[in-house]
């Protein structure tokens, strides 16, 4: 990861809190947030300080996701409203920013990539190379028709986990949240996979450079 990107990610993590476990769910679609929130509720029993960051795929859905989270009773915030350290009472942050997702992945402990968790017409997954390139373990669903080769390579490399339903998602999240060394091993496997298959420096720069001028 370029030094400048690493610095941005470190600053984001400091604002979230270095001590809280953080899961970033990126490129989510309608229906997936419900699944994620249900899984999150179950995880709070074992990880009461867990922070879930949800980055909807489409900006026009930011407001509806904020309302969905509020209806379910979670303490939430919008990333665009954050100034300085995040209130420790916030359980879920909505990443209502553009171009920032790779840095959010880099600041996370675990990444969940949307567009794959439930069947969605016309959608067959999203780019799992983003979290892999920054050394973060990735979880994705079975609906990866548009990224079959990449997902197969990632699974073979031990760079992530594929889940079939909410129960499976909870199991894999618990496994990773409970095991920091495992997160390191899986994240490093993803970084090496990107390096071996596409060239880490070029890929990481292509993924992240556009956001360096975007908060």
Model-derived regions, located:
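Nucleotide-activated sugar donor-binding and catalytic core shared by glycosyltransferases
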Residues: 1-215
């Amino acid at each position: 990861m370029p030094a400048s990107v690493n610095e941005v990610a470190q600053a984001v993590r400091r604002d979230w809190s270095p001590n809280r476990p953080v899961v970033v769910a990126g490129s989510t679609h309608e229906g997936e947030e419900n699944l994620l929130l249900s899984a999150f509720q179950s995880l709070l029993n074992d990880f009461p300080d867990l922070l879930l960051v949800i980055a909807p795929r489409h900006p026009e859905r930011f407001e509806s996701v904020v309302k969905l989270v509020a209806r379910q009773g979670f303490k939430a915030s919008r990333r665009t409203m954050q100034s300085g350290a995040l209130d420790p009472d916030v359980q879920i942050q909505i990443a209502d920013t553009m171009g920032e997702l790779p840095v959010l992945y880099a600041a996370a402990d675990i990444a969940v990539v949307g567009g794959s968790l439930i069947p969605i017409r016309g959608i067959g997954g999203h780019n799992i190379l983003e979290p892999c390139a920054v050394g973060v373990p990735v979880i994705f669903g079975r609906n990866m028709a548009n990224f079959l080769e990449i997902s197969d390579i990632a699974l073979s490399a031990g760079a992530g986990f594929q889940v079939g339903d909410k129960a499976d998602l909870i199991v894999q999240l618990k496994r990773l949240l409970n095991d920091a060394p495992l997160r390191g091993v899986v994240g490093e496997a993803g970084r090496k996979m990107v390096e071996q298959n596409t060239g880490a420096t070029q890929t990481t720069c292509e993924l992240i450079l556009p956001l360096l001028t975007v908060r």
